[in-house]
Amino acid sequence: STIICTAVLITAAVRGNIMFNTVLELLKSRNYKAIREIFMDMNEADVAALLQQFYDDHEVEKYELPLLFRLLNKDVAADVFAYMDSDTQMMLINAFTDKELQEIVDDLYLDDTVDIIEEMPANVVARIIKSADAETRKQINQILKYPKDSAGSIMTTEYVYLHRSYTAKEALDWIRHVGMVKETVNTLYVTENRKLVGVLSLLDIVTADDNDKIEDIMEDNVISVDTLEDKEYVASMFSKYDFLSLPVVDRENRMVGIVTFDDAMDVIEEETTEDFSKMAAVAPSDDSYFKTSVFTHAKNRIAWLLILMLSATLTGAIVNKYQSAFAAVPVLVSFLSMLSGTGGNCGSQTS
């Protein structure tokens, strides 16, 4: 399976390089129509990865990235933007006009906007906030007030709620009316005076009779999390219950938002990376490993390297001096593997 995964990654990398070179040649010849057609046939995540290559390639002029981004269909531009890393996003924001930035912010999902804001310097944040409408600014500020590692900090307020008195037909009409601007319509939440009272899926409504009441087909035993719940625990709930989204409530059981599956996966990836860093005795970093300077990597490891080098030197001296003791008391040999492990620790720190 490892060989298969490696082969898939290599194939993807080769395809990515071929696409990069193709678009680069079209860009040099100013064949913008052909580039647009290529973008239209690609998934948003693949387009973002391609544009990321242009940002990372030092031989490509930086002004060409905003030019390529402007060739995207406006319907997918915000989705592509959300997939990019924070450095590329900041570069594009600085290149955007106020009107262009407003269009992107209007089309972004709220949780993506908050994620971007959390990675940006104050002057860029000010531009983003200024570009948002009053209601979006209010929702952004609501999410930003929650602690960094809480459920509230990773939730979105863009969910579909229903009244228990709706019929299935009325519910479908409501979903059609508001669904396009919501994060998801797969899971629907029933509220009464803002309090969460039930949950059901879109499939439940589609397969029900038109006159069936929502309160008759909803599930009233709803699993939810508090706004201040640790986000790592929230992510574990998705693994346990196979949720696509999870409702977030305040202390009075009033529904304030949902955490979606993609945000839970981001948390799991972040926590896994942090755990691996701790296993190697390296301070976890929010920055990309490959974009962190050699000096920063060295600074994070130098203290442990010095300690391990000194302990390895001391261990070697002790072993050489007391070789006769090892011969006289063989049980001491069992400690050699532990002592020699410092060499492996040095290797993991250096790599």
Language model feature labels by segment:
Residues 15-283:
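Hydrophobic packing positions in regular secondary-structure scaffolds
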Residues 272-351:
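Alpha-helical transmembrane segments and their membrane-interface boundaries
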